[in-house]
Regions:
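Active-site environment of divalent metal-dependent phosphoester hydrolases
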Residues: 17-20, 71-74, 105-109, 163-167, ...
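Short aromatic-enriched loop/helix-cap "lid" or pocket-rim segments at secondary-structure transitions
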Residues: 20-26, 113, 169-172, 211-213, ...
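Mid-to-C-terminal alpha-helical segments outside catalytic/metal-binding sites
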Residues: 1-15, 19-58, 63, 245-250, ...
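Active-site gating/metal-coordination segments in enzymes
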Residues: 62-65, 72-167, 295
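Catalytic pocket-lining loop regions of alpha/beta-barrel enzymes
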Residues: 121-126, 135-250
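Conserved, mostly hydrophobic/aromatic
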Residues: 13, 85, 117, 150, ...
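Short, flexible/disordered intra-domain loops and linkers
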Residues: 26-28, 41, 74-76, 167-180
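Alpha-helical scaffolding within the catalytic cores
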Residues: 47-53, 82-86, 110-114, 183-186, ...
Length: 295
């Protein structure tokens, strides 16, 4: 139940606060965490499974969780991570909405693992697409089998757009080129797959105008805004959230780097009417979930 101080949240994108949840990531060791620590001003202090669940309850949040870097792993290790995530979800269904599945679509065993997750995973299961995987940008042929699996299952695909925190501030940016996160790839995937629900993840800066145009043009495109304080949203995004994008935007946090409590306070600072915030925090997500048949 929402209160004046703690609204009910459906968080369409956060990560794990547990050490196990960072297995396989570029930040698995303490030395590798310094760049991320500086970018988010987050101390990288981990919590237990139970502490994580309690933090979500305190925030009144139901969360879509993302490992992000499982595409780099051998398939047996990927399956172990997914089983860990699914066990956590089954023990804490009140705070876990579901999971974004990140795989390497060039590996047939990874594609089979996605198929298993879509079939057996608890809650909402969707595919997370990163352009820096071996398959390249999401409009490349290597992604087609996975996109079709999601379309057939009636489950969404998350395509990351805009500036990435991964590699930010490091020499060479960990080899990641930002062009691969241009909204043009959301536009292309949505056009080719009109029966596929495509969610653009993050604020799309420095291409926010293109992302707004894509969301307005394609009825199968939504936006979730994890990883950014609303204080720093581009001006045109701030304006359109209360206007033409009002029904197209989902709340996303990026826990544990950004806490739910901080983001709620900063959303409220922007001066949106209460009914607009209700749509962003829960209403739009509830309508979307009802449309795809997820409780």
């Amino acid at each position: 139940m929402s209160t004046d101080t703690t609204p009910r949240l459906i968080d369409f994108h956060s990560h794990w606060g547990t050490e196990r949840g960072w297995r396989g990531s570029p930040y698995e060791t303490a030395a590798d965490r310094e760049a991320l620590r500086g970018y988010f001003k987050w101390g990288m202090s981990f919590v237990s499974d139970e502490e994580q669940a309690e933090q979500f309850r305190t925030a009144n949040a139901r969360v879509m969780l993302d490992f992000a870097f499982t595409y780099t792993m051998e398939v047996g290790a990927v399956r172990e991570q997914h089983d860990y995530a699914f066990d956590f979800a089954r023990r804490h269904p009140d705070v876990v909405l579901g999971h974004w599945i990140g795989i390497d679509p060039t590996q047939p065993a990874h594609v089979k693992e996605l198929e298993r997750c879509l079939s057996d995973g608890p809650g909402l299961i969707g595919l997370a697409v990163h352009s820096f995987t071996p398959a390249g940008t999401p409009d490349e042929p290597g992604w087609e089998a996975c996109l079709n699996l999601c379309r057939e299952a009636g489950r969404p695909v998350l395509v990351h757009v805009g500036m990435s925190a991964t590699g930010a501030g490091t020499r060479g940016g960990m080899g990641i080129t930002l062009e691969g996160s241009h909204p043009r790839y959301v536009d292309r995937v949505a056009a080719r797959h009109p029966d596929l629900n495509v969610i653009a993840g993050r604020v799309a800066w420095p291409w926010q105008s293109e992302m707004i145009a894509t969301a307005l043009h394609k009825g199968n495109v939504w936006m979730e805004l994890h990883g950014w304080s609303p204080r720093y949203f581009p001006g045109e995004l701030k304006r359109e959230i209360g206007k033409r994008l009002r029904k197209r935007v989902f709340f996303g946090a990026d826990y544990p780097m950004l806490s739910h409590e901080r983001l709620v306070a900063e959303w409220r600072e922007q001066g949106y009417p209460a009914d607009v915030l209700d749509d962003v925090f829960t209403g739009n997500a509830e309508a979307f979930l009802a449309e795809i048949g997820v409780a």
